[in-house]
């Protein structure tokens, strides 16, 4: 069953943007999770968080008490071997891998209209390179990009361009799969 064996690689869990991870993992709002058809929740050992740089104390406690794996910004940007190792680990225990990115994980210069940015994030091209590595694997099947500033919060369309860079990275990974599918 798809929803029983899906893995998430999460960009950042701060503020309410982390709520979907907690719900999906069965750590909060159990009725919401069940009503969405996700029962049981995703095992925390099937979740990898990347480039997390700013957790409030309660979030930090919850994440540290779980089996969530982590990839640092440096890992995502400079260690494709570690990215591949996490994807391979997840592929052994899941049917489908979902990659989720909250745009506030990026370098604040690329998402200037986002209220939750934190310094020292990867650029969209850097994270796009990590997405290329991830999406080379056939079990990496879905990408979510959330909280992209738009309209008056992105007058120069920098955030939109950053989101496109992420999509291009993922699509390049799919293109490089054997068989190109």
PLM ranges: what are they?
Residues 47, 68-69:
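Short, conserved active-site loop motifs that form the nucleotide-linked donor/cofactor pocket
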Residues 69-181:
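Catalytic cores of soluble, metal-dependent hydrolases
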Residues 1-36, 40, 137-141:
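Active-site histidine-anchored catalytic micro-motif
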Residues 1, 25, 51-54, 72-74, ...:
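Short, structured patches in soluble enzyme cores that scaffold and shape functional sites
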Residues 40-41, 45-54:
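An alpha-beta-alpha
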Residues 54-61:
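Short, glycine/polar-rich helix-capping loops at beta-to-alpha or helix-loop-helix junctions
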Residues 3-4, 54, 103-107:
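Short, glycine/acidic-enriched loop or turn micro-motifs at the edges of active sites
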Residues 1, 50, 99-103:
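Active-site flanking residues adjacent to catalytic metal/cofactor-binding acidic residues
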């Amino acid at each position: 069953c798809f929803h029983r064996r899906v893995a998430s690689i999460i960009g950042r869990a701060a503020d309410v943007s982390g709520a979907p991870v907690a719900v999906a993992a069965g750590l909060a709002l159990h009725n919401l999770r069940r009503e969405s058809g996700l029962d049981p929740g995703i095992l925390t050992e099937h979740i990898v968080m990347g480039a997390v740089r700013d957790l409030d104390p309660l979030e930090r406690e919850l994440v540290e008490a779980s089996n969530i794996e982590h990839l640092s910004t440096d890992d995502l940007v400079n260690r494709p071997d570690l990215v591949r190792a996490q994807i391979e680990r997840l592929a052994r225990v899941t049917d489908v891998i979902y990659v989720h990115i909250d745009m506030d994980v990026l370098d604040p210069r690329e998402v200037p209209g986002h209220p939750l940015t934190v310094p020292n994030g990867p650029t969209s091209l850097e994270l796009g390179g990590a997405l290329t590595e991830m999406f080379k694997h056939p079990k990496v099947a879905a990408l979510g990009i959330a909280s992209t500033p738009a309209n008056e919060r992105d007058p120069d369309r920098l955030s939109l361009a950053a989101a496109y860079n992420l999509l291009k990275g993922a699509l390049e990974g799919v293109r490089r799969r054997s068989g190109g599918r």
